[in-house]
Regions:
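Feature captures hydrophobic
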Residues: 1-151, 157
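Conserved class I S-adenosyl-L-methionine
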Residues: 166-174
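Conserved SAM-binding loop of SAM-dependent methyltransferases across substrates and taxa
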Residues: 177-188
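Conserved SAM-binding loop
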Residues: 205-206
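A short glycine-rich, Lys/Arg-flanked "PGG" loop and its adjoining helix->strand segment in the class I
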Residues: 253-267
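Conserved beta-strand signature within the Rossmann-like core of class I S-adenosyl-L-methionine
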Residues: 266-275
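Substrate-binding/catalytic lobe of Class I Rossmann-like enzymes that use SAM or dcSAM, i.e.
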Residues: 275-445
């Protein structure tokens, strides 16, 4: 590992352990400069076994401290070519990937995958989101812009790109807490069907819609998108706001086929916003497990732009035509930075003494985060990755250092995990390793797009 760090070309990393300090790279260049303090020898075990995922879990466990998490991510991305040479055990990596396939987004699995993230408790999301409860990339305008204004700007952009009209019936595909549905009705008077698989989101969305007096225009359903019957529903517009990341690579054609069947055959418009993986790394990413799809979004998949377009072409048999594409990674980096600041500022005040509404989900997270990984049937159910990798004892549960239990409140490991999640994604978007892409699809003979709102 140290030999690999010696080959880094951008920025520097200083590592301290038990008073010993060593620096790698060039502290004088303009790249990120990272300082790590190793607090437990278990850090090295995790790092050598599962590399960047091991680092994330060591941070969750309190086995390492970092002066700047975002700069750490930037350092890793800039030096990925050399750092990946110190790759994780191929046996471990293969087993990790096989184990992750149990989170595949079949109809049976998808509801539990969604619940594992979005049903952690509305009070947690309320703490870092703005009053619109919009959990997606905002579109910013100047350094003094507020999160709420930036989120409304994003919602307006999607509504305008879809050319939503008062007479339209709109599908809000993955409606969250209802902000897009409500904004569309507020601006145009259209009718909206919002669908979600999160019971927590549905409850809050319906409350907010009723309070706004929009219940006659908006319906929220707890349903998988694949179960909407095209014989019963025909939508003029479909807007999918950062939902396709929960679909899974193998289901992209199925997703677009269903959208094609639900969308009006002539004047239909579909607008999609998604985080998108760099094309260069996409094949490798598809066959690996990372921090996000293990600890944050089980079953999650960050598609590439070409995978989305190919899925749309295959699923619709060429009848969903790509109209436009735009990328906003810098806007997502700023959004994540603001979320992280709000999360950390409010955690001790809001969450540390609040019992999660669904504590069992956090208990399940402990099983995922601990040293005992759940392996597929081809491996012993009692084996840990450490035992498989080098025959030593199992890694300690990252939750053993927690000061509180899930029953008592959101614990400090939960806090470090979400802090790492925000910083990890911010660094990836800031370096454009990940994009935030808006795609517009329409029908070949759709003349409605001459609307001047669309021609911006």
């Amino acid at each position: 590992l140290f030999q690999t760090l010696n080959t880094t070309t951008v920025g520097s990393m200083t590592i301290e352990e038990d008073g010993d300090v060593i620096t790698f790279g060039n502290p004088d260049d303009s790249g990120p400069h990272v300082y790590l303090n190793i607090l437990s020898e278990q850090f090295w075990v995790r790092l050598m076994l599962v590399q960047d995922l091991g680092f994330a879990e060591a941070y969750m466990a309190g086995e390492v401290s970092v002066n700047n998490l975002v700069d750490f991510v930037r350092f890793y991305i800039y030096n990925r070519a050399s750092l990946d040479a110190a790759s994780a055990s191929p046996v471990v990596s293969s087993l990790m990937y096989l184990a992750s396939t149990r989170f595949g987004n079949s109809i049976l699995n998808t509801a539990s995958n969604i619940s594992a993230h979005y049903d952690l408790g509305n009070e947690m999301f309320e703490m870092f989101l703005d009053s619109t409860m919009t959990y997606s990339c905002a579109i910013w305008n100047g350094p003094d812009d507020t999160l709420e204004a930036a989120q409304l700007r994003k919602l307006d952009m999607l509504i305008d790109k879809a050319c939503v009209k008062p007479t339209d019936y709109v599908l809000d595909l993955g409606c969250g807490w209802g902000s897009l549905s409500m904004r569309a009705v507020e601006r145009t008077g259209c009718r909206v069907l919002g669908i979600t698989l999160s019971t927590e989101q549905k409850d809050i969305a319906e409350q907010r819609i009723a309070q706004a007096g929009m219940s006659d225009r908006i319906e929220i359903m707890l349903i998988d998108y694949r179960k909407l019957d095209p014989e019963m529903y025909c939508f003029d517009k479909i807007i999918s706001l950062e939902m396709v990341e929960h679909v899974g690579y193998e289901y992209l054609p199925v997703y677009f086929e269903q959208c094609h069947k639900l969308l009006h055959h002539q004047h239909g418009v579909m607008v999609l916003q998604s985080s998108t993986m760099n094309e260069e790394r996409y094949s490798e990413y598809r066959h690996s497990v990372d921090f996000i799809n293990k600890h944050i979004f089980p079953g999650g998949h960050c598609p590439s732009v070409s995978a989305l377009v190919a899925g749309a072409t295959k699923g619709s048999r060429g009848m969903l035509m790509l109209e436009s594409a735009a990328n906003f990674p810098d806007h997502y980096a700023r959004t994540l930075r603001v979320w992280r600041e709000r999360f950390l500022c409010g955690f001790d005040k809001v969450l540390s003494t609040v019992a999660p509404k669904n504590a069992q989900l956090i208990l399940q997270e402990q099983e995922l985060a601990g040293g005992q990984y759940q392996l597929p049937a081809c491996a012993s159910s009692t084996s840990s990755l450490t035992e498989i990798g080098n025959g030593s004892s199992a890694l300690p549960d990252v939750y053993k250092h927690s000061n509180t239990t899930p029953e008592a409140g959101y614990n400090d490991v939960f806090r470090r995990k979400w802090e790492y999640y925000f910083a990890y994604c911010e660094g990836a978007f800031a370096t454009r390793a990940i994009g935030c892409t808006q795609l517009v699809f329409t029908r070949t003979y759709n003349e409605d797009l001459s609307d001047p709102r669309f021609l911006m």
